[in-house]
């Protein structure tokens, strides 16, 4: 991608001053939002393992190149420690966040990434998937399909039980669908994956008392009939999270997400069970001796929230054994930390700038675009993308461990990410030209452009707090837009407040900086579709509808055809720009040298019940 002269000198100006503010490290801007299904991404789950030697090279750290940049290709995703495990033991997991976790601790109701970092320890999907994101028969349930692919028959293993000893049943699996499809459901899950089930829309609209396409065959067997057969059905579109009917069955659906069964006494069938909760701060888990994969090696896991500003000290002292993620801007100065092994993967996530283009119609269950919105002019959106230099941001803020985003399908899905699509290059001169030609002129002489109608233009920009880098990075974007004559007013908000306001289409937000965790299935419908609650831009377009539908059509079983469709969709979104990606990202996780059998990413076959330690106490850094 061509870089203008301004890109090369930026470090001596605005960006250099921001770097000076962050020289002591810090975190990026908070967590990632989630998409329309827990197994469809957004949670960035970590299931990891460890190396052993204290030598930096042997501990998974790769030296930076001569340019001071690191590459995610130099990291492994499974620990390599070969020490002997002790009996039992306890580990401490740090949930890295500058805010409390919200506490909606059930896959059927949660919406924020911090909550899923808690849930993953005590609950899990009934189906697992391989490194290509295809469902396997190695999980708590197995599946078969009819010859035409429209009917799935699921069988839950006999030894899969809730933590209270009750069996996980087909009725529980059906019940989850009934709750999510209910008109009073207040969570974010209901969307295209559910409306594709035969009879779901009739049930949701109150025209039927049952979902005709879901049948309980026996206690452990469930059959679901889907309306449209697509490759997504085996890569993420099946809802694989049951809901314990013996606990929730007598509750009103509208009361479930705020109930003690979600907030104080959550239940699952995973390797650990919840022993105690300090709301928003910490959770103590004890092992589930009857876990279906086998009794866990560890006796206990302690999860506590760790501020990004103190995560290094916690790791060095052995206060935590491993963390949800590590602020990559702090990696260079800690790459040789002697008591940890560094794991890394290309994250299924990206940061982005979103433009508010409409509102959510709750009654109709769809997004509605509004041509009168402040950011409705695509020429204004084009100029704002051209005005920011994310290549330099990735290099200078993150030493290459975040890099310029080009399309809305990240490289975590290499078979569908279009490497030939360069997005929109950094070119402030072109940005100025676009605004000039579109009629945005400085009428009043105050240095800021007015609208083509001569009215004042103030763009309200919301971004998340989250450590030392969050605000300077957001201010870099503001200053970049000011350099092309746009008056942008920045508001920094903590994670929960930020998403409350963005979800509610608050009138005080015109643009926002968010982060998406994408699904195991590449299908972007859950993030950018007409009926997707998580489509926070509220963008709709018939061509967008068509391309998203083509991507999950029967023709899309041909992977080459599907890739072609998604290449076309990526290019379409580069032209339409309801949002633009800013950075793709590496996910780095340091793991204490005493930890055995931990892995991050997908399809590695290492599970949390295998997690073990070689010593009673965590190793401290030298």
What are these regions (language model features)?
Residues 1-10:
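Bacterial Sec-dependent N-terminal signal peptides
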Residues 591-622:
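Long beta-strand-rich cores associated with HINT superfamily self-processing modules
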Residues 73-77, 91-147, 267:
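N-terminal lobe/hinge region of extracytoplasmic solute-binding protein
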Residues 25-70:
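Short, low-complexity, disordered segments immediately C-terminal to signal peptides
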Residues 189-250:
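Surface-exposed binding/hinge segments that line
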Residues 86-90, 121, 138-140, 149-151, ...:
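Extracytoplasmic
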Residues 3-4, 131, 157-186, 271-397, ...:
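Extracytoplasmic/periplasmic ligand-capture domains
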Residues 20-23:
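C-terminal motif of bacterial Sec signal peptides marking the signal peptidase cleavage site
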């Amino acid at each position: 991608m061509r870089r203008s002269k301004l890109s090369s000198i930026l470090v001596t100006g605005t960006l250099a001053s921001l770097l000076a503010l962050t020289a002591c490290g810090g975190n990026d801007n908070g967590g990632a939002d989630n998409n329309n299904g827990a197994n469809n991404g957004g949670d960035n789950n970590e299931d990891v393992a460890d190396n052993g030697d204290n030598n930096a090279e042997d501990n998974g750290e790769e030296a930076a190149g001569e340019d001071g940049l690191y590459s995610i290709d130099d990291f492994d995703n499974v620990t390599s420690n070969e020490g002997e495990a002790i009996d039992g033991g306890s580990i401490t997991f740090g949930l890295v966040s500058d805010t409390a976790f919200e506490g909606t601790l059930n896959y059927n109701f949660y919406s924020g990434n911090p909550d899923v970092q808690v849930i993953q320890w005590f609950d899990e999907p009934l189906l697992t998937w391989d490194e290509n994101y295809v469902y396997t028969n190695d999980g708590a349930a197995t599946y078969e399909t009819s010859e035409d692919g429209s009917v799935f028959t699921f069988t839950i293993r006999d030894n899969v039980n809730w933590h209270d000893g009750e069996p996980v049943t087909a009725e529980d699996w059906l019940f989850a669908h009934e709750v999510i499809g209910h008109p009073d459901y207040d969570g974010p899950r209901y969307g295209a994956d559910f409306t594709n089930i035969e009879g779901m829309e009739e049930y949701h609209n109150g025209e039927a008392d049952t979902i005709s396409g879901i049948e309980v065959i026996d206690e452990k067997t469930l059959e679901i009939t889907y309306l449209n057969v697509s490759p997504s059905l085996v890569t993420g579109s099946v809802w694989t999270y049951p809901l314990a009917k013996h606990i929730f069955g007598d509750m009103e659906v509208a009361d479930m997400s705020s109930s003690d069964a979600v907030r104080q006494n959550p239940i699952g069938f995973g390797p650990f069970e919840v022993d105690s909760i300090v709301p928003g701060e910490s959770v103590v888990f004890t092992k589930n001796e009857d876990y279906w994969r086998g009794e866990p090696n560890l006796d206990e896991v302690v999860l506590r929230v760790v501020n990004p500003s103190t995560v290094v000290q916690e790791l060095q002292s052995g206060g935590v054994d491993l963390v949800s993620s590590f602020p990559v801007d702090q990696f260079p100065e800690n790459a040789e930390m002697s008591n940890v092994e560094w794991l890394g993967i290309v994250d299924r996530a990206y940061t982005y700038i979103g433009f508010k283009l409409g509102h959510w119609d709750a009654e109709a269950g769809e997004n509605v675009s509004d041509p009168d919105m402040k950011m409705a002019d695509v020429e204004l959106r084009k100029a704002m993308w051209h005005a920011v230099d994310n290549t330099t941001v990735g290099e200078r803020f993150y030493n290459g461990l975040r890099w310029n985003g080009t399309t809305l399908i990240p490289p975590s899905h290499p078979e569908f990410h279009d490497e030939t699509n360069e997005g929109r290059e950094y070119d402030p001169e072109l940005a100025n030209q676009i605004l000039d030609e579109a009629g945005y002129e400085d009428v009043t002489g105050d240095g800021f452009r007015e609208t083509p109608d001569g009215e004042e233009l103030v763009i309200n920009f919301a971004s998340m707090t989250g450590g030392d880098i969050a605000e300077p990075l957001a201010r870099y974007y503001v200053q970049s837009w000011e350099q092309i004559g746009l008056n942008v007013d920045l508001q920094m908000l903590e994670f929960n407040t930020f998403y409350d306001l963005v979800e509610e289409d608050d009138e005080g937000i015109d643009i926002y900086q968010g982060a998406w965790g994408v699904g195991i299935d590449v299908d972007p419908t859950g993030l950018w579709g007409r009926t997707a609650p998580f489509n926070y831009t509220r963008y709709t377009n018939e061509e967008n509808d068509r391309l998203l539908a083509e991507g999950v059509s029967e023709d899309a079983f041909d992977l080459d055809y599907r890739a072609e469709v998604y290449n076309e969709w990526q290019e379409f979104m580069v032209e339409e720009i309801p949002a633009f990606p800013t950075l793709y990202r590496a996910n780095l996780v340091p793991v204490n040298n005493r930890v055995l059998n931990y892995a991050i990413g997908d399809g590695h076959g290492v599970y949390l019940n295998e997690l073990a330690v070689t010593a009673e106490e965590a190793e401290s850094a030298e």
